């Protein structure tokens, strides 16, 4: 494979896309392909199948926007530096285990999130969804996929306004069941600040006021989701650990 220029859409292209590709039984058996967006940003895609029949797929792009642009609710890459995308997946016997990382992006106009923020009495943050968007600096999702069932072991998104940690499953076109924790950034700061020495080092001795977060459940058919929330007074060690990572 050796292509001088490949257009991903009307605005994005990859230069010097080259590498090796082997297809068996109408599936990619092996791939090692790379290209450049420009002198700094690049893309690399690999597929390797080992002796026990496990297929390992990786995709790294130092520009995430061209790859996620079709998801209309993800915005903001053009505002302040491109975020990157890093994907890893291993598949065997029809079951894939994957990790997706996206860096520095905004989300806009997500009805389920807007309802969750409203129920949590975080209307000011909810208003951002229809305005400039809510920014997340770190996003990671660990999940498995078998047939049409996606199981999310852990999804976390950390941002300057809110942070979210959730788990659950999505059965394509049938049922969504998610549960997790949503916390405003001020609450995270206050909780970390309460840790002796560490809090003073990371946050300082003066911490702004803020509300505690909520635990939530989102369940139902994709077009008829029911959202419930309950206030929380403490953060789990896992949530704080993820925030500090």
Role assignments for model-derived ranges:
Residues 223-245:
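Gram-negative outer-membrane assembly/targeting C-terminal domains
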